[in-house]
């Protein structure tokens, strides 16, 4: 069976060995006579899956002592509310850096819950770059500063994470596991799984344990981080199959050489596509400024709408899937998360070059 070149923004490509392993184990997981989907979440077989996923993630990201890993539901979108509900206590201010649509949504939810301020933004430039935080005047009563590490729609990414005098919170949904970083720099990290971690259905939260002490009482039980930390993310039935798939993806990342090896591959993949853009003589125009370019989402436009439609139609015929840009940017977007192989990027670059020669 011929597999598509999958450049979808999320849900997105999964490693083929992971899919094949899941297929093999689907009907009879570890000789239980049941699928993972049929196991009780209180069974010792599922408990081992749950524990393995947590430990693998801890190893891969070098999560230090004093932090905990939670497996939640509701996607990163629910974290837009949970973060301020738990951390934005009375009289404190939530600081937000606006770098795209997802950070805007995070801010919008926080505004419903408490006091907020925008400390930096690149909205005026249609989010073509990551704004520096060097000259920020931090409020004395700042609770945290929230950033979005990678912006899928606009194709920008923080190259270095900021050292901030207040607790740093990050939505890493679209680039977690794509490069090494220091977890201890953050108070809380969250990530929906469906880009670099596995299929949709589970959300990873990594939080510093001392944050639990500042959570106000009276929150709805399921929206209180303490509920899930105390119960090892088993307070209610977790998304067991999604966590099983997460564990398989993490095992695959370890087999590839870990997060540093992923970064090297991702740099190679992105370089192939950005080279096709930069050497096109302006036929393909990048959305992001060079210093802020994402290794995960390569965004570009063609000279006009008609050519864009032709490009996307021909790309689809060649087996390239998911290349349409978001309506707020237009043009095209290639999402090249960890599971997208270098060969797919090389094939796309080759098609881009051929298309340019015909239509430039």
From Swiss-Prot:
It comes from the Bacteria. HAMAP family: SerC_aminotrans_5. The modification N6-(pyridoxal phosphate)lysine is found at residue 195. Catalyzes the reversible conversion of 3-phosphohydroxypyruvate to phosphoserine and of 3-hydroxy-2-oxo-4-phosphonooxybutanoate to phosphohydroxythreonine. Keywords: Amino-acid biosynthesis, Aminotransferase, Cytoplasm, Pyridoxal phosphate, Serine biosynthesis, Transferase. This is Phosphoserine aminotransferase. It catalyses: O-phospho-L-serine + 2-oxoglutarate = 3-phosphooxypyruvate + L-glutamate; 4-(phosphooxy)-L-threonine + 2-oxoglutarate = (R)-3-hydroxy-2-oxo-4-phosphooxybutanoate + L-glutamate. It is found in: Cytoplasm. The lineage of its organism: Bacteria, Bacillati, Bacillota, Bacilli, Bacillales. Belongs to the class-V pyridoxal-phosphate-dependent aminotransferase family. SerC subfamily. Its EC number is 2.6.1.52. It is an enzyme of class 2 (transferase). L-glutamate binds at residue 42. Pathway: Amino-acid biosynthesis; L-serine biosynthesis; L-serine from 3-phospho-D-glycerate: step 2/3. One of its GO terms (molecular function) is pyridoxal phosphate binding. GO terms for cellular component: cytoplasm. Pfam families: Aminotran_5. It comes from Geobacillus kaustophilus (strain HTA426). Binds 1 pyridoxal phosphate per subunit. Homodimer. CDD domains: PSAT_like. The gene is serC. Its main location: cytoplasm. Pyridoxal 5'-phosphate binds at residues 76-77, 102, 152, 171, 194, 236-237. Its cofactor is pyridoxal 5'-phosphate. One of its GO terms (biological process) is L-serine biosynthetic process. Coiled coil: none annotated.
């Amino acid at each position: 069976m011929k597999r598509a070149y999958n450049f979808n923004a999320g849900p997105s490509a999964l490693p083929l060995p992971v899919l094949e392993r899941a297929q093999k184990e689907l009907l009879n997981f570890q000789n239980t006579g049941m699928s993972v989907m049929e196991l009780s979440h209180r069974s010792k077989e599922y408990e081992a899956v749950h524990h393995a996923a947590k430990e693998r993630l801890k190893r891969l990201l070098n999560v230090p002592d004093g932090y905990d890993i939670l497996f939640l539901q509701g996607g990163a979108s629910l974290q837009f509310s949970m973060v301020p509900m738990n951390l934005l206590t009375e009289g404190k201010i939530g600081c937000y850096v606006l770098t795209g649509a997802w950070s805007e949504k995070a801010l919008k939810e926080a505004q419903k819950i408490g006091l907020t301020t925008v400390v930096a933004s690149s909205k005026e430039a249609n989010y073509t770059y990551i704004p520096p935080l060097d000259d920020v005047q931090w409020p004395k009563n700042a609770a945290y500063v929230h950033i979005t590490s990678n912006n899928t729609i606009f194709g920008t990414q923080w190259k270095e994470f900021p050292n901030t005098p207040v607790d740093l919170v990050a939505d890493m949904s679209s680039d977690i596991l794509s490069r090494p970083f220091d977890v201890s720099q953050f108070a809380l990290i969250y990530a929906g799984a469906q880009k670099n971690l596995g299929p949709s259905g589970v959300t990873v939260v990594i939080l510093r344990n001392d944050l639990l002490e500042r959570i106000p009482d009276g929150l709805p039980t399921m929206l209180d981080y303490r509920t899930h930390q105390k119960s090892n993310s088993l307070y209610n039935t977790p998304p067991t199959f999604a966590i099983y798939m997460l564990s398989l993806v993490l095992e695959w990342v370890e087999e590839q050489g870990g997060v540093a090896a992923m970064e090297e591959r991702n740099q190679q993949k992105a370089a192939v596509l950005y080279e096709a853009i930069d050497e096109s003589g302006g036929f393909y125009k990048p959305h992001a400024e060079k210093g802020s370019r994402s290794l995960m989402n390569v965004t570009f436009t063609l000279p006009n709408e008609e050519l864009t439609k032709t490009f996307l139609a021909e790309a689809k015929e060649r087996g390239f899937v998911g290349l349409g840009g978001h309506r707020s940017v237009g043009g095209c977007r290639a999402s090249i998360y960890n599971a997208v192989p270098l060969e797919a990027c090389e094939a796309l670059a080759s098609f881009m070059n051929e298309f340019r020669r015909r239509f430039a």
